[in-house]
Amino acid sequence: MKKILLIGGTSLIGQHVIETAKSKIDCPPRDIIDLKNFSTIADYDYNGYDCLIFVAGAGMRHGRDITFEKMDKEYIKDTIDVNCSGATFLLQKYLHHNPKSVVVVIGSGAVYKTSTPNVVYTASKVYLDRMIDILENTYQDTFFIRVNPSKVNSRFEHVDWYIDPKAVAKGVWHCIENNIKKLDISYPKDK
């Protein structure tokens, strides 16, 4: 990889992807690419990238666990705007300029759950995961990689069995270096 575009570099996983990178990484701040602002997505120059690593997301900040009934309209809109609408438009723009590249999407182990209190977050991650299925058939020269970690340690105290963001970053690079299309990372079954 010569030039990588990272979306979500301020997340814990994104920070560890940057720390462990062996290639040049461009990580535009939110004022340059804001997934809730289509004009910033449209205005970015996507030319010349070998790889997109998409780790941005909304709706599960630091273990947020809210029921469907308690979700307010701002939470719902923010989660869908970032995880679905913004992600879709960004992928459209990126793939238009780089149809023969690598696209890594760090999603969520929640895509496998059929029972969860966080309906909106989980549904948005299922949308993103399914969209990658469809894009793989459309962009056959693009190598798509999905990394779906279960609960990631996101500044929780006294929770040693959540997945370390460093391990997820290591998994991302392992998939890229070894042409692995999918990696599910989960915590021990007895937890």
What are these regions (language model features)?
Residues G57-K77, P117:
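Conserved mid-core segment of classical short-chain dehydrogenase/reductases
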Residues I7, Y49-G59, N83, V105:
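Rossmann-fold scaffold of SDR-type NAD(P)-dependent oxidoreductases
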Residues E69-F89, L128:
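Catalytic Tyr-X3-Lys loop
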Residues G86-Y94, M131-I132, C175:
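Hydrophobic positions on the long internal alpha-helix
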